[in-house]
Amino acid sequence: GVGFKAGVKDYRLTYYTPEYKTKDTDILAAFRMTPQPGVPAEEAGAAVAAESSTGTWTTVWTDGLTSLDRYKGRCYDIEPVAGEENQYIAYVAYPLDLFEEGSVTNMLTSIVGDVFGFKALRALXXEDLRIPPAYSKTFLGPPHGIQVERDKLNKYGRPLLGCTIKPKLGLSAKNYGRAVYECLRGGLDFTKDDENVNSQPFMRWRDRFLFVAEALFKSQAETGEIKGHYLNATAGTCEEMMKRAVFARELGVPIVMHDYLTGGFTANTSLAFYCRDNGLLLHIHRAMHAVIDRQKDHGMHFRVLAKALRMSGGDHIHAGTVVGKLEGEREVTLGFVDLLRDDYIEKDRSRGIYFTQDWVSMPGVFPVASGGIHVWHMPALTEIFGDDSVLQFGGGTLGHPWGNAPGAVANRVALEACVQARNEGRDLAREGNEIIREASK
């Protein structure tokens, strides 16, 4: 007989290994699978493990030149999803050697690059990844992290306040700087470029950077507080992005910004390295995330994108608001907020956390609550997010009937009132509106 047998093979034989004991160095993934009708869950789970690691659809003679057992992904557990008739969570373990060190890009290409178009599946969603210390230690992570940022800004014991400058498109650089100044002068810690403000005909990046820097230093001198504006360095090429970051450093501003999903992880990691080497903080916006994470049964959950960002590097990242959404959503949001800022996060399925994650002292990222929030949400936000967060009010500041500065004052006063009330032991959930009403006098 021939030693090599060609043909299409059953994935289950090689890639479904329920007896496998996961290694401390394995990268683990939890996938929410919806197989096509008639495809058994084990076959689907094995197919996911195969297609995202060493497998191909047929036996090839070159398989004999390597040790599949050493390099293959393994589906080691499958559980049905409660309340869904044909949906399963498949757990896959990947050997560490499948991944390039320090490359989020390669990690994602391997795990989610190919398998999502797989015919035997109707839908697939990466719910969570367990990043082992052996891999996370090959990343430098956030340029500075929560603690260092507080020290640089000299702001402690409260959330930080931000505001996106609106109208996001159409202001001249001079007027844009003016709006920045008003907000910072009124009491905000940060203002922000909108994610789609890059370098358009009505306002070129260099002009904006210059006038914003002027606004920063003026408001800083007048308030005696350190101020920042997230200067968006996102650009069409990595070289252009770096040029903008370098100019920001030359101006002496404290922080720049990047759209990490549209800009890409490779660009983001380069920028994070530059920021670390040059003392710039890095604010990350998640434009495009909903394209990837909005559908429950297909795509990638935001907690995976959040973990990837913490590895790639960023000091702040947008993380939703929680206010006014469903209870369950609140728990899940708090789950990935903790994954961003804590050192050690226990597995907790009620919060959507499928694996215990140990970051081994990789710096944490400030979660940014932003989008449709205003001063009356302040008690809830303070309670939900705690001190280590950035609360961002766009229209909630600039929409103030008296203008930007009074809007900023209102937000700062409300925040200080909520923090004080909490520290005095009052119940923010119950007395929130009363606290704001008193403060507004």
UniProtKB/Swiss-Prot annotation:
This is Ribulose bisphosphate carboxylase large chain. SUPFAM superfamilies: RuBisCo, C-terminal domain, RuBisCO, large subunit, small (N-terminal) domain. GO terms for molecular function: magnesium ion binding; monooxygenase activity; ribulose-bisphosphate carboxylase activity. Its cofactor is Mg(2+). Gene3D superfamilies: Ribulose bisphosphate carboxylase, large subunit, C-terminal domain (3.20.20.110), RuBisCO large subunit, N-terminal domain (3.30.70.150). The disulfide bond which can form in the large chain dimeric partners within the hexadecamer appears to be associated with oxidative stress and protein turnover. PANTHER family: RIBULOSE BISPHOSPHATE CARBOXYLASE (PTHR42704), RIBULOSE BISPHOSPHATE CARBOXYLASE LARGE CHAIN (PTHR42704:SF17). GO terms for cellular component: chloroplast. Substrate binds at T164, K168, R286, H318, S370. The modification N6,N6,N6-trimethyllysine is found at K5. CDD domains: RuBisCO_large_I. It comes from Hemionitis engywookii. Binds 1 Mg(2+) ion per subunit. It catalyses: 2 (2R)-3-phosphoglycerate + 2 H(+) = D-ribulose 1,5-bisphosphate + CO2 + H2O; D-ribulose 1,5-bisphosphate + O2 = 2-phosphoglycolate + (2R)-3-phosphoglycerate + 2 H(+).
